[in-house]
Curated annotation (Swiss-Prot):
SUPFAM superfamilies: Cyclotides (SSF57038). Keywords: Disulfide bond, Plant defense. This is a cyclic peptide. There is a cross-link at residues 1-31 (Cyclopeptide (Gly-Asn)). Coiled coil: none annotated. This is Cyclotide mden-J. The presence of a 'disulfide through disulfide knot' structurally defines this protein as a knottin. It comes from the Eukaryota.
Length: 31
């Protein structure tokens, strides 16, 4: 939840979810 993954998730889910990133406030974050 604190480290930005450099990916937005406004229109599509986080592709980076495979490495533990999750959508928060339209941006993908890790932890």
């Amino acid at each position: 939840g604190s480290i930005p993954c450099g990916e937005s998730c406004v229109y599509i889910p986080c592709i980076s979810s495979i490495v533990g990133c999750a959508c928060k406030s339209k941006v993908c974050y890790k932890n």
